[in-house]
UniProtKB/Swiss-Prot annotation:
InterPro entries: NA-bd_OB-fold (IPR012340), Ribosomal_uS17 (IPR000266), Ribosomal_uS17_bact/chlr (IPR019984), Ribosomal_uS17_CS (IPR019979). The lineage of its organism: Bacteria, Pseudomonadati, Pseudomonadota, Gammaproteobacteria, Aeromonadales. NCBIfam families: PRK05610.1, uS17_bact. It holds the Pfam family Ribosomal_S17. One of the primary rRNA binding proteins, it binds specifically to the 5'-end of 16S ribosomal RNA. It comes from Aeromonas salmonicida (strain A449). One of its GO terms (biological process) is translation. This is Small ribosomal subunit protein uS17.
């Protein structure tokens, strides 16, 4: 069974936890009735083993097994420093 590994890009909005960051994933959706394109944001908790991310960084993350109650994503790379 070959499942595709989910990867996303987002902006770090909080780095105050130990070995964890909060990443905001922004996507654009069409309003179901009016058709206007709206920005929607999802906040994810991400595992950052080396505490290398700072708020404002653009990062790539991938899904993994659940690491805690709210953490099931891990940091792959820092694409752009803040």
């Amino acid at each position: 069974m070959t499942d595709k590994i989910r990867t996303l890009q987002g902006r770090v909005i909080s780095d105050k936890m130990e070995k964890s960051i909060t990443v905001a994933i922004e996507r654009k959706v069409k309003h179901p009735i009016y058709g206007k394109i709206i920005k929607r944001t999802t906040k994810l908790h991400v595992h950052d083993e080396n505490n290398e991310c700072k708020a404002g960084d653009l990062v790539e993350i991938r899904e993994c097994r659940p690491l805690s109650k709210t953490k099931s994503w891990t940091l792959v790379a820092i694409l752009e420093k803040a």
